[in-house]
Structures are given as structure tokens and as C-alpha cells.
Amino acid sequence: AVMGRNLALNIESRGYTVSIFNRSREKTEEVIAENPGKKLVPYYTVKEFVESLETPRRILLMVKAGAGTDAAIDSLKPYLDKGDIIIDGGNTFFQDTIRRNRELSAEGFNFIGTGVSGGEEGALKGPSIMPGGQKEAYELVAPILTKIAAVAEDGEPCVTYIGADGAGHYVKMVHNGIEYGDMQLIAEAYSLLKGGLNLSNEELAQTFTEWNNGELSSYLIDITKDIFTKKDEDGNYLVDVILDEAANKGTGKWTSQSALDLGEPLSLITESVFARYISSLKDQRVAASKVLSGPQAQSAGDKAEFIEKVRRALYLGKIVSYAQGFSQLRAASEEYNWDLNYGEIAKIFRAGCIIRAQFLQKITDAYAENPQIANLLLAPYFKQIADDYQQALRDVVAYAVQNGIPVPTFAAAVAYYDSYRAAVLPANLIQAQRDYFGAHTYKRI
């Protein structure tokens, strides 16, 4: 409800009159009461709401993904005319969007599945917007979406036509997977700095402030520096009294499931999903901590040197994560015939969304230089970073393993990097085993 309200207010603030409807009359009245003088027009029946709109009608749905979306569409259909446009801005599974697009197209309606990132504040002030569906329908809503989208530093709005049917929601799903990876990598960096150097919250905030002024400059690093020094009403550091169980809404899982369907090695992002799952086994972990032995963390040595190693490891880990995510976008684009523009996708992530970061421009540049590049690690800038920073990543992972500090995504980054650069892997033995017990055959060199 908050996302829908904020998007309505955003659209209204750009000079539009907005018809609004909610199943709950009270919620509609509440929005009107809280926003006097705004060009928001309330309606209390679907029929009146639809009839209030100019044709072709442009209807933005912001409802809980799943059955709720189908129910909302079904309630609208009796009052729609051919050519009307429904925009689904929810966190919808892309296969559902493909299905709805197909069904509504057959009835003469247009359906635009649209990823919206930036949370409640982004919805109000300018989100990153990822629309997918019929190109001609997108052209009819583009003027509105362009006006309400976040604006990057170079003045470009953070919205672009992504591709047919489920492309927009697919890109949003991968965006969310990348977000999982970013957050877990940052959490592991925090764990290493606390476990290896015993940094105070003030020192952690200072470290992240410095990081945010360099290559790692991003929304997530920026908010993390603030989180470290936030105190509760009792004067305790808030982060230190938050239970170590990370919840999830399932979008990271969808990204990993799609990777399995496509045969894409999305290891880092998948480890970040699993890290949330194991965090939720709090009772088991507490019990296991009293039974299972392991090393106690020893000092990581020189403070400045280790902080810099962790910074480098974090940046290279982030690059590996995005390389995996964009490789998956390429595989999905081929599978679903979307013709995705990867440079443009990186561009619209530069503002408004949760993963906004300075280095996204480097991704856009890499695809501008070579649109067909198979993997971002092969682009000159990222190859150079890998050359310069891989030793730090290896050192940090080795330290973590020796000292019993779990770093699933840092470790996944090293494993993927070494696997990807290996001309020969031991898979020949696996294939021989498969042939031995199952007559699966093999290819000779």
C-alpha cells in the first residue's frame, strides 16, 4: 500500500491528475486526507475508477504478487477496452508475467510487467524502473515513467525499455539477487574486521566512510556506515542488539532457481541466499556452538594492511557477483528471446535503486566497448582489478578459513574466479564415472 501511495504521489507531483482505488475504502480515504490539495481523485468502485481514465487507459497495479495480482486484473477486465494498458509494478515472478502478458494480449489488452526498485522513498522521490512488455505499449507510458524515475548524475532517467513479456521483472529479480550478494559480502567484511581486528563501531563507521569515498562508493556502503553508529533509546549500538537472523522474501531464491534452470553457475548470489537460511537456524547454531570445535580467531595483524585487504576482497567479490548476474541475464535473454541491452540495464541501476553504485558506470562502459563480451571479468577494467586484487581476496579467504570465520561469498568468489580461468577442470573424471555406472558416454579430447 505504501509503494502504491508513494508512486501515485510521485506521478501527481509531475503534473498529472491521478485516479486512485483501493479495495479498502478506508485506505483510499486515508491517502486523500493525508494529502490535501493534491490532484488525487478517489474512486470506490472498480467500474468508476476505470471509467474515469482517458483511453488508452494506463493503470498501475501495486498489489502483493501472486494470486492478488490475478484477482486485481480479473476485476479490471470487464471495464477495459482493447488497447488499454495494465502496468504491474509488484515484485512478480517473471514466469507469471509471461503468462499474464500472453493471456491479456489474446484479449486485446496490453500488459507491462515492471520492476520497481528503491523502496518506499524511491517510489516517492524517483525509483529505478524496469518495464517489459509490448514495445508500442511501453511508448504510451514512457513519458510518465521517464518523469517519475530517478535521475543519474549525468541527467539520464533511470528507466529504459527492457524487452518483451517478462523481461522487466526478470531483470528486477536478478537485481534483487545481486542485492543479496552485495549485502552478504558487506556482512562478511564486517565480520572479518570485527573478528580479525576487533574494530569498534566507531572505527567500522570510519572505515566504511573512507570506503564510500572510493571504488566501493554505493548506497549500501553509505547506509552501512550510518548503521554502525546508530544507538537505541538505552544508548546501546543498535546493530549489536539486533538478532542475527536475516529474513528474505524469496526473490533471491527465484534468481538461484532460474540459474539452475538455465545452467548458470550463480554461485556467489546463491551462497548469499543460503547464508540467510543458515542464519535463521539460530537455535541449532547456538546448540552446535557448544558441541562442534574449531579455531578461535587470532589477530589479523597490521590494522591498516588488513583493512585494505578486506576492501580489495570486497570490491573484487562484488565484481564477481555482478559478472555472474550479468552472465545469467545473457543466458536468459537467449532463452526467452529478449534481446537485452546489458549496458542500458547497468545504466538504470545508477540511481534510485538499492544496488546503485559508482562502479555500475564501469559495466556500462564495458558493454559499450564490447556488447558481445561473454563475461565482465574479461573486460579490461575488471581484468585489471582482478590482477591487482586477487591476492588480497585469497589472503582474506585463507585467513578466514584458518580462523574459523565463515565467508561463504568471499570463498565463492575465489572458487568461481579460479574455475572460470581454468582451461582444464577435473570434470573429465566425473564424466568417466558417469559413463562407468550409467553408460552416459563421453567426448575425447
UniProtKB/Swiss-Prot annotation:
Source organism superkingdom: Bacteria
GO BP terms: D-gluconate metabolic process; organic acid catabolic process; pentose-phosphate shunt
One of the record's GO molecular function terms: phosphogluconate dehydrogenase (decarboxylating) activity
Catalytic activity: 6-phospho-D-gluconate + NADP(+) = D-ribulose 5-phosphate + CO2 + NADPH
Positions annotated to bind NADP(+): 1-4, 22-24, 63-65, 91
Key word Oxidoreductase present: yes
Recorded metabolic or biological pathway in which this protein acts: Carbohydrate degradation; pentose phosphate pathway; D-ribulose 5-phosphate from D-glucose 6-phosphate (oxidative stage): step 3/3
EC identifiers of the protein: 1.1.1.44
Residues noted as binding substrate in the record, renumbered to the chain: 91, 117-119, 175-176, 180, 249, 276, 434, 440
Keyword Ribonucleoprotein: no
Top EC class of this enzyme: oxidoreductase
Keywords assigned: Gluconate utilization, NADP, Oxidoreductase, Pentose shunt
Active-site residue list: 172 (proton acceptor), 179 (proton donor)
A Pfam family it matches: NAD_binding_2
Family per record: Belongs to the 6-phosphogluconate dehydrogenase family.
Job description of the protein: Catalyzes the oxidative decarboxylation of 6-phosphogluconate to ribulose 5-phosphate and CO(2), with concomitant reduction of NADP to NADPH.
Subunit structure: Homodimer.
Protein name listed in UniProt: 6-phosphogluconate dehydrogenase, decarboxylating
Source organism per UniProt: Shigella sonnei
